[in-house]
């Protein structure tokens, strides 16, 4: 069953401006060490950071909290599966909110898609609950 859906559009130029103006102060407040490492490897850092920013906003919307109720930027981390597919790793208040959403006998699955077409980056998040089975 679908528990939450969130989407966000982010202006890449806005993120690039924040990177120029605030530098590490911005990236350390919003992004995890892993996200910063991945983004900083890229020649075009702005779109990479913007996609992740949009993912965090979309996730907060799917959780039903926005950036409040104990959910913070760094509680949501964009990571990649071995296949390269992006997904989200939740910690802290985001993980706690997710646990409150999931009915007994179910486990959460998070689905994430990211894209950009300058000047915009977009993310879409679906939170799904699936029954726990002996083979899960």
Curated annotation (Swiss-Prot):
UniProt KW keywords: Cytoplasm, Fatty acid biosynthesis, Fatty acid metabolism, Lipid biosynthesis, Lipid metabolism, Magnesium, Metal-binding, Transferase
Subcellular localization, as worded in the UniProt entry: Cytoplasm
Gene Ontology BP terms: fatty acid biosynthetic process
UniProt cofactor(s): Mg(2+)
Any GO molecular function: magnesium ion binding
Similarity remark: Belongs to the P-Pant transferase superfamily. AcpS family.
Described function: Transfers the 4'-phosphopantetheine moiety from coenzyme A to a Ser of acyl-carrier-protein.
Name of the protein this chain belongs to: Holo-[acyl-carrier-protein] synthase
Organism for this UniProt entry: Methylorubrum extorquens (strain PA1) (Methylobacterium extorquens)
